[in-house]
Amino acid sequence: MIKNDLFLKALKGETVQRPPVWMMRQAGRYLPEFIALRDKYDFFTRCQTPELAAEITVQPIRRIAPDAAILFSDILVVPQAMGIEVLMKENVGPFLPNPIRTIQDVERVIVPDVHQTLGYVFDAIKLTKQMLNDEVPLIGFAGSPWTIMCYAVEGQGSKSFDKAKGFCFSHPEAAHVLLQKITDTTIAYLTEKVKAGCNAIQIFDSWGGMLSPVDYQEFSWKYINQIIEALADITPVIVFGKGCWFALGEMGKSKASALGVDWTCSPRHARYLSGGNITLQGNFDPSRLLSPIPVIKKMVHEMIDEFGKDKYIVNLGHGILPNIPVDHAKAFVDAVKEYNQ
């Protein structure tokens, strides 16, 4: 039994004394102990070495004590497993030297045996669960098929992902074949993550907001929903779409347990758009953690008041930034724990 099950209760929509709190990218570059390991080991060594991934996962639990842990990994381990080369340039981001640009490129992409290609992730989960000792739940995650495809086609990060969008619009059949391959791999991967010990799953649709509402349905939501349908009976699923407020109504009708919201959509509007029944997660502007600590705490309490304490998970509206002072991150978590006291 998980000792602190606030997060799991919120996912079920149960009444809680206070909402749970965790932060996207909480195992990250704002922590000096994370920087110490980053300086010794390259990015994918940290991801692919279970002992390192587990240690990085529990660092924020020790330091700022959120109500859930999220496994240290990366969304791009999935395309790596599918035979797409992925490099990570420190302080720059991902670089894929052989981007997918043709139908022939799509045909070369494999749907792998996830045990053979991603076994290190499942080993990291088992090790992390031992280290957590059932203190808090463990979240596993994956990128949405559309977001993975953005990197696979673009070859790197982008402000517009026009190459990825152009591929969808000029070669829609090939795009759908690629999206389905990514979806099938992701379902197998996340299923094994749950079997290995993850208590919930989050799907990151980081670039969903790049699409129009109509294109979002065709190229992103259709595939996210396949993943939800495949997993909903075995684990709670959270969907976070950055800039995807326009899809909250559709998402709210799905079997997802919770929906992540970014800071551009107000709590009340998010409740209204999502239908008012599903648990919401978010949506503190990560840059706001640079505010003075009393301001952070005041704003967190106001945010909880607006969302309501039930069917709500306190989080940021995107990942925590590397330049956030640790005591400010801890103040964010502490503010939630002080709510209603």
UniProtKB/Swiss-Prot annotation:
Subcellular location: Cytoplasm
MF terms (GO), sorted A to Z: uroporphyrinogen decarboxylase activity
Family: Belongs to the uroporphyrinogen decarboxylase family.
Subunit structure: Homodimer.
Name this polypeptide is given: Uroporphyrinogen decarboxylase
Pathway membership, UniProt: Porphyrin-containing compound metabolism; protoporphyrin-IX biosynthesis; coproporphyrinogen-III from 5-aminolevulinate: step 4/4
EC number, UniProt record: 4.1.1.37
Positions marked as site (Transition state stabilizer): D74
Organism, as annotated: Flavobacterium psychrophilum (strain ATCC 49511 / DSM 21280 / CIP 103535 / JIP02/86)
Annotated keywords: Cytoplasm, Decarboxylase, Lyase, Porphyrin biosynthesis
Amino-acid positions noted as binding substrate in the UniProt annotation, renumbered to this chain: R25, Q26, A27, G28, R29, F44, D74, Y151, S206, H318
Catalytic activity, reaction form: uroporphyrinogen III + 4 H(+) = coproporphyrinogen III + 4 CO2
Transmembrane segments: none
